[in-house]
Design a protein with these regions (language model features):
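Short beta-edge strand/loop motif at the mouth of beta-sheet-based domains
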Residues: 58-98
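Mature extracytoplasmic or otherwise solvent-exposed domains
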Residues: 21, 32-33, 46, 51, ...
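Polybasic, proline/glycine-rich intrinsically disordered low-complexity segments
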Residues: 104, 114, 118, 143, ...
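C-terminal motif of bacterial Sec signal peptides marking the signal peptidase cleavage site
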Residues: 13-16
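Bacterial N-terminal signal peptides that target proteins for export
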Residues: 1-6
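Surface-exposed short loop/turn segments
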Residues: 83-147
Length: 217
């Protein structure tokens, strides 16, 4: 075990000093599911979706709205908005190459925002946003997630995190896994689920199972 760990440390050191420099890497992903039929039991459907999301959350915020009187013919779609647009704070963030955009959904039946900080000691954090948009023929489930990975460089903590990632990958692989759990939850209450659109980064593939590929089908 000692020899293997030493070899890993040497491998990390020889891979390139640039990869071990202190840095912060942010990557976003999304998937949009279409769920039919519209006659699904609404409460069972929303509960199943919520249960699937909160299993991997450290912190959770849920908003449920009153169903609309008249359903639209086509569902809406999440949008990314800059909360600091046209402000001094926005200009300051832009000058520091920090682009902060948050997902929002209009006329959503339910919105869920979560944070997963269980791997914060290794410089990793995940934010997860989900909204359920009803329409005439069913529902859309829009999911947007952001993964932040901070590299502490050649510090004991940074080296430890790098060794762990080289063995089992980082916690970004739980994002497509949660997306798949949401899909399975919708199917468990009788929903027929299809993917409308998605973007799953290659880096989000699991160490043992390609969760990214299954989330985008």
């Amino acid at each position: 075990m000692y020899k293997m760990t030493t070899a890993l440390l040497l491998g990390i050191a020889l891979t390139g000093c640039a990869s071990m420099k202190p840095s912060v890497h942010t990557e976003s992903t999304f998937v949009i599911y279409d769920v039919k039929p519209a006659t699904l039991d609404r409460n069972q459907f929303l509960k199943a979706v919520l249960d699937a999301v909160q299993t991997s959350a450290s912190k959770l915020r849920v908003n449920r709205e009153i169903p609309p009187t008249e359903l639209p013919a086509t569902p809406g779609r999440f949008e990314l908005q800059d909360p600091f647009a046209n402000s001094k704070m926005g200009a300051l963030l832009a000058s520091q190459a920090q682009n902060i955009r948050v997902p929002v959904c209009k006329n959503a039946l339910m919105t869920v925002s979560t944070e997963n900080t269980s791997m914060a000691q290794y410089g990793e954090q995940t934010t997860f946003f989900l909204c359920v948009l009803p329409y005439k023929d069913g529902y859309h489930i829009d999911i947007h997630a952001t993964f932040v990975r901070a590299n502490s460089g050649l510090t004991p903590q940074g080296i430890s995190a790098a060794v762990g990632r080289s063995l089992i990958g980082d916690s970004s692989q739980f994002i497509p896994r949660t997306m798949n759990n949401v899909r399975a939850a919708a199917e468990s209450v009788g929903g027929k689920v299809t993917v409308v659109d998605s973007y799953i980064p290659e880096d989000f593939k699991g160490a043992f199972v390609n969760q990214a590929e299954s989330a985008s089908k």
